[in-house]
Amino acid sequence: MKITNVRINQLVGEGKVKALVSVVFDGVLTVTDLKVVEGSKGLFVSMPSRKNKDGKFRDVVYPCTAEMRQAIQNAVLGAYDAMTRSGVAPQAGGLQGAEEPTAVEPAPQLQDESELPWEPGDDGEGARELAAVAGAVAAD
């Protein structure tokens, strides 16, 4: 699966969430509402999430391999960095980046979610930081 486009859809001026982003895979699948977040160790990419009945945020879409997570992180942060350095604000449809597709090896087929190396919906590093600010973005 290749990342064929990254769109910075909205810059968020205040708080830890810096941008809302869409990523296109193989030119046929778009995942929206990724967030560029300022964490204690720098910028990271948070996957789209929803608040469950317990008040915890769970990822709606998440990569099944560390390689795909890293490819998404690199593509999104690269597009965000290019946009912030250029000083160009996103236009309608977003600022496009990641023009060179990023190849990622296909993940092995999993029988069920119990085989995942993490809990589904666990955004890992930065999830707790994001939970504090995600409600403010969701309210917009």
Swiss-Prot record:
Region listing for Disordered, in residue ranges: 88-127
Membrane-spanning segments: none
InterPro entries to which the protein is assigned, alphabetical: SpoVG (IPR007170), SpoVG_sf (IPR036751)
Pfam families (alphabetical): SpoVG
Biased composition (Acidic residues): 112-124
Keyword tags: Cell cycle, Cell division, Septation
Example of a GO biological process term: sporulation resulting in formation of a cellular spore
Functional description taken from the UniProt entry: Could be involved in septation.
PANTHER family: SEPTATION PROTEIN SPOVG-RELATED
Record-stated family: Belongs to the SpoVG family.
Entry protein name: Putative septation protein SpoVG
Source organism of the structure: Symbiobacterium thermophilum (strain DSM 24528 / JCM 14929 / IAM 14863 / T)
Lineage: Bacteria, Bacillati, Bacillota, Clostridia, Eubacteriales
